């Protein structure tokens, strides 16, 4: 699993109510990235991307642009040890 990386991100801006989670899921499935995405009650979106370094980097670049109608103001990210997640999913808001 050493060829995998995991990045935990928090995205701030106009990222809720604009299809950000659904677009993130579609992009992750296309890129072959595992993990999850969810809305936070404070208005941010939280996500975990796990996969090859190139695929995770592609997801991070996509997050900077976001979905149509979104306005990304800032992204906080933290590297974490990969957990071997099996798929990508949209999780409930917390």
From Swiss-Prot:
Alphabetical list of PANTHER family matching this protein: ACYLPHOSPHATASE
Acylphosphatase-like domain: residues covered: 6-92
Active-site residue numbers: 21, 39
Family assignment from sequence similarity: Belongs to the acylphosphatase family.
Keywords assigned: Hydrolase
Keyword Hydrolase: yes
Gene: acyP
Protein name according to UniProt: Acylphosphatase
The keyword Isomerase appears for this protein: no
Reactions accelerated catalytically: an acyl phosphate + H2O = a carboxylate + phosphate + H(+)
GO molecular function: acylphosphatase activity
Entry superkingdom: Bacteria
Family annotation (Pfam families): Acylphosphatase
Leading EC class: hydrolase
EC annotation from Swiss-Prot or TrEMBL: 3.6.1.7
InterPro entries assigned to the protein according to its UniProt record, in alphabetical order: Acylphosphatase, Acylphosphatase-like_dom, Acylphosphatase-like_dom_sf, Acylphosphatase_CS
């Amino acid at each position: 699993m050493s060829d995998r990386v995991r990045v935990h991100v928090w995205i701030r801006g106009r990222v809720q109510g604009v299809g950000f989670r659904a677009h993130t899921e579609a992009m992750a499935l296309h890129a072959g990235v595992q993990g999850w995405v969810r809305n936070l009650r404070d208005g941010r979106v939280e996500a975990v991307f796990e996969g090859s370094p190139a695929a995770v980097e592609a997801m991070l670049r996509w997050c900077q642009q976001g979905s149509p109608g979104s306005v990304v103001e800032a992204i906080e990210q933290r590297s974490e040890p990969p957990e071997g997640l099996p798929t990508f999913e949209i999780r409930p808001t917390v």
